[in-house]
């Protein structure tokens, strides 16, 4: 290229046609920048030196959302090693209920209620069936996320294996009930109400915590050996009872309001 020359490169995976000229590509670039600037303007950011970092974090969280369903994925990548040239290379392109709850809290705090509301209904959709709540789902609510090794790929800087899918999808992790109850409680407080069809879903999660809190599980570390007793899992079972109790009081469900605090106290004493 000589000074003053212009070129463009377009990588596209979209229903929309890619740009066919530099002018077209540049106009789309400008439009995209304006779109995200306008999106950030909807937020409520504190005025201090770290604001730009908060804005960048908000953009990252938004970039990890799947707009057709509201799912929030843990990462956009698979098989990047936890340590250089290591073997702990997992596929994180899925929506973990626990991790998404943290994202939900962050979005609410920064004023992005729309995105948080979308994830709320995604959680409701995956939890409303008769099956037990899983720890994670695909972006469209897929439940079966079987893990597969791609032997023909060498991996990032030679780190292998390269995996797609995640074998932890069917693990028992007892923090999941507290995570979903906490996210629904946060949503209910921000909305001053809860859709009527949601309450039976939440009661089922509380009852699951009551039934299983004494049992061993795989924990937030997703251990692939024998189940163990993790304090963090017991704490989140207590959270399920505590948030369930608070929601029950908001709904003036006096019977549950009398029962659940007693069980929460039992879990608290055990911890």
Located regions from the model:
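Acidic, mature catalytic/reactive cores of soluble proteins
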Residues: 1-271
């Amino acid at each position: 290229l000589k000074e003053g020359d212009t070129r463009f490169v377009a990588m596209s995976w979209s229903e929309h046609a890619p740009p066919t000229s530099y002018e077209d590509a540049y106009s789309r670039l400008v439009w995209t920048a304006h779109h995200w600037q306008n999106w950030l303007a909807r937020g409520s950011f504190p005025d201090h030196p770290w604001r730009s970092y908060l804005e960048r974090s908000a953009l990252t969280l938004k970039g990890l959302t799947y707009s057709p369903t509201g799912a929030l994925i843990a990462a956009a990548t698979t098989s990047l090693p936890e340590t250089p040239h290591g073997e702990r290379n997992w596929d994180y392109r899925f929506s973990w209920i626990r991790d998404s709850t943290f994202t939900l809290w962050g979005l609410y705090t920064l004023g992005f209620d729309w995105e948080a509301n979308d994830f709320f209904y995604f959680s409701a959709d995956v939890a409303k069936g008769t099956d037990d709540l899983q720890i994670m789902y695909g972006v469209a609510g897929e439940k079966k996320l079987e893990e597969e090794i791609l032997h023909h790929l060498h991996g990032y800087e030679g780190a292998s294996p390269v995996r797609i899918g995640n074998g932890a999808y069917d693990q028992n992790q007892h923090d999941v009930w507290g995570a979903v109850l906490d996210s629904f409680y946060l949503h209910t407080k921000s909305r001053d109400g809860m859709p009527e069809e949601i309450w039976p879903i939440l009661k089922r999660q509380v009852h699951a915590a009551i039934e299983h809190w004494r049992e061993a599980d795989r924990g937030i570390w997703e251990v692939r050996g024998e189940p163990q007793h993790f304090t963090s899992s017991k704490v989140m079972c207590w959270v399920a009872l505590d948030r369930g109790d608070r929601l029950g009081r908001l709904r003036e469900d006096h019977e549950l309001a009398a029962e659940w605090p007693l069980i929460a106290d039992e879990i608290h004493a055990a911890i």
